[in-house]
């Protein structure tokens, strides 16, 4: 059994991603639940220096997922906040630190959960397209989830997976970074788009 942490972006902009995650997990025999009390993980306010507000949101998440066996997150950024930075937020509060460490141990990014916990690399799907893969920065650098998405993609039948030049370079989004430094963000995105287009892939 696993609990889905839906993330703000999935909830507000891409709900179909959440639906797809649930479908994939259920096809693998996972009983998925969706704790109703969940809210933002607190990363945007934490990255903006508002640690007090971040703690309030984090405490809500700790309480909401306290009984979950696994917490599956379709976002490297949110998963990193919960796994890496919640213990840092509560390092001076022994009781909450223990709760943060307990949650940290059961938080998994989606592809990581499939490969590491379920032991699944072949989902039994096919797609006769060409694709290239961009690894998200938080997923790559903070969670160290590097190979799991590629293992899954390489098992997609008929899919031609093309290498992305400078794949590990940031796309320029970085959450609040793109708002605080829009011109730098646009430049980084421009470089990323050029590299993606150079592959000739149908899908990113």
Residue ranges and their predicted role:
Residues 1-203:
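Iron-sulfur cluster-binding electron-transfer modules in prokaryotic oxidoreductases
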């Amino acid at each position: 059994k696993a609990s889905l942490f839906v993330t703000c972006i999935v909830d507000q902009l891409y709900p179909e991603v959440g639906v797809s995650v649930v479908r994939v997990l259920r096809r693998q025999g996972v009983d998925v639940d969706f704790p109703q009390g969940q809210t933002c993980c607190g990363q945007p306010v934490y990255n903006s220096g508002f640690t007090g507000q971040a703690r309030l949101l984090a405490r809500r998440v700790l309480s909401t997922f306290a009984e979950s066996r696994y917490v599956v997150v379709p976002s490297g950024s949110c998963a990193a906040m919960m796994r890496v930075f919640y213990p840092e937020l509560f390092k001076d509060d022994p009781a909450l630190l223990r709760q943060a460490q307990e949650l940290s141990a059961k938080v998994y990014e989606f592809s990581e959960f499939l490969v590491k916990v379920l032991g699944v690399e072949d989902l039994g799907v096919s797609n006769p397209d060409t694709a290239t893969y961009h690894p998200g920065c938080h997923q790559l650098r903070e969670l160290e989830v590097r190979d799991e998405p590629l293992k899954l993609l390489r098992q997609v039948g008929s899919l031609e997976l093309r290498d992305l030049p400078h794949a590990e370079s940031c796309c320029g989004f970085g959450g609040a970074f793109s708002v605080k430094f829009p011109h730098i963000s646009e430049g980084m995105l421009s470089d990323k788009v050029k590299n993606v287009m150079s592959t000739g892939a149908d899908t990113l």
